[in-house]
């Protein structure tokens, strides 16, 4: 049986600094940045227990926080390797060879998209739509 996740005083202080940026009735505006803080503290991903703790802390529904966590690609809801590799799969990058780069990475690291290497050093992230540098594509991001 796992223990319930509790937000530490240090993490609460960081989250409080985020919350202060917004009107008092807009705590939900702090969800993305708060998830990133908690993710950083939890080896690169958030769990259901973390989402529940943040829900209680911000008084925002769990489902609202879960929807944010699963919508934004920079938030991981499953364990990932130490270094996260993301290859853009948008049209401009695809036309310039992102598929070939992705295939090369898969072969070199012996993993598929959505997997980590056996030593947990690398995780190949899935579905990155745009890294906002289309003129320099194909683009990829590490960490």
Set out the residue ranges of the language-model regions:
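Signature of N-terminal electron-transfer/Fe-S-associated modules in redox systems
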Residues: 1-143
